[in-house]
UniProtKB/Swiss-Prot annotation:
It comes from Petromyzon marinus. Its cofactor is heme b. The cytochrome bc1 complex contains 3 respiratory subunits (MT-CYB, CYC1 and UQCRFS1), 2 core proteins (UQCRC1 and UQCRC2) and probably 6 low-molecular weight proteins. This is Cytochrome b. The chain crosses the membrane at residues 37-57, 81-102, 117-137, 182-202, 230-250, 292-312, 324-344, 351-371. It holds the Pfam family Cytochrome_B.
Length: 396
């Protein structure tokens, strides 16, 4: 009787981990392209770490030299301009993928895997923190004033706020000490993100992926490789194609022109605003006339994602077969787009009023509308079960 050779990827202590994650992983056969964004986020993180390391080799974290060192990277370092453009626009692609990933999670009820969802929300918050401290590093006008305005919000905390701000700044204003520590945070956080990503994947593999039907995935599963590995590679090609097109043809389209001006503490820009992917949260912050209230609203705008698993009242997992919930979901997306636009507008009438309405709608959808609709749709399904036919007049 001949001895069957063992496959090393299945028996090796280290390779077997990769095998169970990327090769022999049982995956639902019917997952759509919306399930691609997790792997795209991994690609974005790897790309950001590689380009970031190359940039860090030439960057100088000093208020006198930071701006010049970024110019030096673009002008004198071989392909430095490309690394800088890929890193800056890679952040935008990162957040596009994050928002698509979160949107898919809300639509298809992925948040019911509570551990995976909670780690994901922490990942989102850490990514936002990483992007914020990174935006300060070029030491342009918007870098300096963005850092000043956003960090100064912490002073709204009762009793300890002012002390925390001075401690964070390393002085009584945003200075060289602030830039040095922000560079340190920006360097270390992506590696923490990578570790958290492994925890995120570990929790996901405890339950397995959900699927577009919202039913038990164990009925029909196939191995990850070659089916979904090739599907992911197609996503990689599309993402990299878009990223390179932006980086080569319109590298500054998503940036802020004021950041090409050296930071000047004596001259405030006409409109202080963050990068486009934070504008919705910035709009919510500005919608509250009270400083502390604005900070609470800003934190709540992201942390509200943590309550979704507990406000889920529907008998169905996702929104695939729930017309009312679908309409509300797309109203939420439109509301976020409106908040993003409003965040870039001046803080004056009518924009402030529009922002307050849009912010109220945002919170109401999560806290009230989704739970109430879940309850109503349960009642409608019960009625249709008793009568033998679905009463569409109750839906539309």
């Amino acid at each position: 009787m001949s001895h069957q050779p063992s496959i090393i990827r299945k028996t090796h202590p280290l390779l077997s981990l990769g095998n169970s994650m990327l090769v022999d992983l049982p995956s639902p056969a019917n997952i759509s392209a919306w399930w691609n964004f997790g792997s795209l986020l991994s690609l974005c993180l790897i790309l950001q770490i590689i380009t970031g390391l190359i940039l860090a080799m030439h960057y100088t974290a000093n208020t006198e030299l930071a701006f010049s060192s970024v110019m030096h990277i673009c002008r004198d370092v071989n392909n430095g301009w490309l690394m800088r453009n890929l890193h800056a626009n890679g952040a935008s692609m990162f957040f596009i993928c994050i928002y698509a990933h979160i949107g898919r999670g809300i639509y298809y009820g992925s948040y019911l895997y509570k551990e995976t969802w909670n780690v994901g929300v922490i990942l989102f918050a850490l990514t936002a923190a990483t992007a914020f401290v990174g935006y300060v590093l070029p030491w342009g006008q918007m870098s300096f004033w963005g850092a000043t305005v956003i960090t100064n919000l912490i002073s709204a905390m009762p009793y300890v706020g002012n002390d925390i701000v001075v401690w964070l700044w390393g002085g009584f204003s945003v200075s060289n000490a602030t830039l040095t520590r922000f560079f340190t945070f920006h360097f270390i956080l992506p590696f923490i993100l990578a570790a958290m990503t492994m925890i995120h994947i570990m929790f996901l593999h405890q339950t397995g992926s959900s699927n577009p039907m919202g039913i038990n995935s164990n009925l029909d599963k196939i191995q990850f490789h070659p089916y979904f590995s090739f599907k992911d590679i197609l996503g990689f090609v599309i993402l990299l194609g878009i990223l390179f097109m932006i980086s080569l043809l319109a590298p500054n389209a998503l940036g802020e022109p004021d950041n090409f001006i050296y930071a000047n503490p004596l001259s405030t820009p006409p409109h202080i605003k963050p990068e486009w992917y934070f504008l919705f949260a910035y709009a919510i912050l500005r919608s509250v006339p009270n400083k502390l209230g604005g900070v609470v609203a800003l934190a709540a705008a992201i942390m509200i994602l943590l309550i979704i698993p507990f406000t889920h009242t529907s008998k169905q997992r996702g929104m695939q077969f729930r017309p009312l919930a679908q309409i509300t979901f797309w109203i939420l997306i439109a509301d976020l787009a409106l908040l993003t636009w409003l965040g870039g507008e001046p803080a004056e009438y009518p924009f402030i009023l529009m922002t307050q309405i849009a912010s109220t709608v945002y919170f109401m959808i999560f806290i009230l509308v989704f739970p109430i609709l879940g309850y109503l749709e349960n009642k409608m399904l019960l009625m249709s079960k008793n009568t033998g036919k679905f009463n569409w007049k109750l839906v539309y």
